[in-house]
């Protein structure tokens, strides 16, 4: 750098030097974003429910909601209903045309542990409208309102529970939600992180959770902003 006679500063740095400066900043930014992504992923993995004696398995609720996606979820929902944990069960996200009998047939070895379709027909509703977790929450909210329910036991896979709770608590603010995670075979293995398929499953779920969190954030900010002036007064 030099100063001309009139006092104006003139930058004699080469263009390549300036480009290197911007390149370094960009590299630092990318490294920071990667570090933030990894930190978030580790936090997400740590928050995924694990089998624990502290899990609430005894509180009865007005209804049970099972999110489709695996035989373990269905079997758990039917078992809870049979044990009297609730009087009604909604299976949300059923493919169009699929019947209760067909869902029971998909239980495989677990089929013998649940009542037959005729016994379940009185208390089980199949929801065909939902195509996503957000859709599950919307479909469930409408069904719960029709049935006058104020509490629900939510059954889904443990790795899916964080996003499900986020969507349900955002969509059903007046409903008490009791999480009831099930543990699919692929995540029961203590060395699941060595299996590419399971790692991809968790990473994809992490990305979906971030997207759901981004969708929920404006509503949370609005709620906080409406609460803040009142709390100050």
What is each of the regions a protein language model found here?
Residues 2-26, 109, 121-124, 143-144, ...:
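Membrane-proximal intrinsically disordered regions of secretory-pathway and membrane-system proteins
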Residues 2-5, 49-196:
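A structural signal for short, hydrophobic/glycine-enriched beta-strand patches
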Residues 12-55:
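N-terminal type II signal-anchor transmembrane helix
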Residues 27, 72, 204-207:
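Residue-level micro-sites within transmembrane alpha helices that shape
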Residues 44, 159, 168, 206-209:
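Aromatic side chains
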Residues 61, 219-233:
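Short linear elements at protein peripheries
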Residues 195-225:
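A transmembrane-helix-recognition feature enriched in membrane-embedded lipid enzymes
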């Amino acid at each position: 750098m030099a100063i001309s006679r009139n006092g104006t500063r003139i930058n004699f740095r080469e263009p390549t030097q300036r480009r290197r400066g911007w390149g370094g900043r960009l590299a630092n930014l990318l490294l920071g974003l990667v570090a933030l992504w990894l930190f978030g992923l580790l936090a997400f993995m740590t928050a995924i429910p694990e089998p624990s004696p502290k899990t609430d398995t005894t509180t009865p609720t007005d209804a049970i909601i099972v999110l489709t996606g695996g035989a373990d979820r269905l079997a758990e929902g039917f078992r809870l209903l049979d044990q009297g944990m609730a009087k009604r069960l909604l299976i949300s996200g059923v493919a169009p045309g699929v019947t209760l009998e067909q869902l029971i047939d998909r239980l495989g070895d677990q089929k013998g542990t649940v009542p037959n379709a005729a016994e379940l027909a009185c208390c089980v509703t199949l929801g065909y409208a939902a195509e996503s977790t957000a859709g599950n929450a919307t479909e469930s909210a409408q069904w719960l309102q029709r049935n006058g329910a104020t509490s629900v036991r939510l059954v889904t896979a443990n790795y899916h529970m964080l996003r499900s709770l986020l969507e349900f608590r955002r969509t059903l603010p007046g409903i008490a939600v009791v999480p009831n995670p099930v543990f699919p075979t692929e995540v029961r293995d203590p060395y699941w992180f060595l299996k590419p398929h399971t790692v991809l499953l968790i990473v994809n779920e992490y990305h979906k959770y971030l997207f759901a969190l981004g969708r929920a954030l404006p509503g949370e900010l609005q709620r906080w902003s409406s609460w803040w002036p009142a709390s100050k007064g």
